[in-house]
């Protein structure tokens, strides 16, 4: 029974992903070169059809339960891409409803979801007790790693029909997540949170104008956008607004830096914390001259005199919207809090 349920669950995951793709085709060329005598404007691209290899089978209205994250403090970090019980006119909600209906009809299943604030703890407790209520577990990645090291997760590369090489999976993530030739987690079109939680840096357009600062857009185009340049711009804005001789959340800052901003800057600089050896095992790789240089610059930027570090989401939004921060580091999904500002 458990084997049948497991196969059904993984078939469902594969079909959920293929339904997200909408039957798209990918434009490709034979070798990436162009004949100088060919009018390229009239050459039609070759279309390669993306196929879904799934068995023709009906599972008799079996329920497949997803365990997902409910962030009670910040709902934008909750899962909204797995289940909804009705259409409401919102794009993501209605797309999920339609997709699930297609999958349920194709496989003869019922998709269900349990949202939990501590999804990984619930998964661990159930699995330890031999409870098979949950078929697919989708905690935050750092928590998923804990479950993998404790032996609770399957090697996805061994799963029939999951087809991690398909374009609806994020191939880069899958490649990076291979540990000792096993893949315990991946992501792709099945999740929008992995995109919405991308760390970004917003800037206040009004402050750029008021202080006659260089445009971040132009700096990027001219390939002069560096950590040093960010620090230079930030220092031009920082000042003691209330004149009490102390720098607090009531003053003006070059940057409000989230708790995870240093790691984001470090990785964005092209550095890594671990690499893999020939056998796919992780090797600690901090300590090179460049990594030390990058860390020094990152810490100076995020923890220095021109940055308010780890102020919390609410304070950071208030400071930015009141024009008292040039830069703010957030996840992309946090953009909803900045609607009162002219940001870039």
Predicted regions and their residues:
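Glycine-centered hinge/linker elements that transmit conformational signals in sensory
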Residues: 231-234, 264-312
């Amino acid at each position: 029974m458990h084997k049948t349920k497991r196969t059904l669950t993984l078939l469902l995951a594969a079909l959920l992903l293929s339904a997200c793709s909408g039957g798209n085709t990918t434009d490709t060329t034979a070798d990436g070169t162009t004949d100088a005598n060919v009018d390229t404007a009239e050459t039609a691209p070759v279309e390669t059809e993306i196929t879904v290899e799934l068995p023709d089978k009906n599972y008799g209205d079996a329920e497949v339960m997803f365990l997902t994250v409910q962030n009670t403090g910040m709902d934008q970090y909750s899962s909204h891409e797995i289940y909804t019980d009705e259409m409401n006119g919102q794009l993501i909600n209605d797309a999920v409803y339609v997709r699930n209906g297609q999958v349920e009809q194709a496989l003869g299943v019922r998709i269900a979801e349990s949202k939990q604030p501590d999804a990984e703890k619930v998964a661990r407790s159930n699995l330890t007790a031999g409870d098979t209520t949950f078929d697919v577990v989708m905690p935050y990645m750092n928590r998923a790693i804990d479950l993998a090291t404790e032996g609770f997760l399957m090697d996805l590369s061994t799963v029939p029909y999951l087809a991690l090489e398909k374009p609806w999976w994020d191939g880069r993530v899958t490649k990076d997540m291979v540990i000792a030739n096993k893949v315990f987690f991946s992501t792709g079109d099945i999740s929008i949170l992995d995109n919405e939680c991308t760390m970004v840096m917003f800037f206040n357009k009004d402050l750029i104008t008021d202080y006659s600062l260089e445009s971040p857009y132009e700096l990027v185009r001219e390939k002069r956008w560096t950590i040093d340049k960010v620090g230079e711009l930030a220092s031009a804005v920082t000042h003691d607004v209330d004149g009490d001789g102390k720098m607090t959340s009531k003053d003006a800052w070059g940057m409000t830096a989230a708790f995870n901003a240093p790691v984001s800057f470090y990785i964005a600089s092209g550095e890594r914390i671990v690499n893999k050896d020939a056998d796919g095992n992780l090797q600690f790789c901090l300590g090179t001259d460049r990594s030390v240089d990058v860390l020094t610059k990152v810490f100076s930027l995020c923890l220095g005199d021109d940055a308010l570090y780890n102020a919390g989401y609410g304070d950071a939004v208030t400071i930015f919207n009141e024009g008292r921060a040039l830069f703010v580091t957030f996840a992309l999904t946090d953009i909803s809090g900045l609607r009162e500002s002219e940001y870039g």
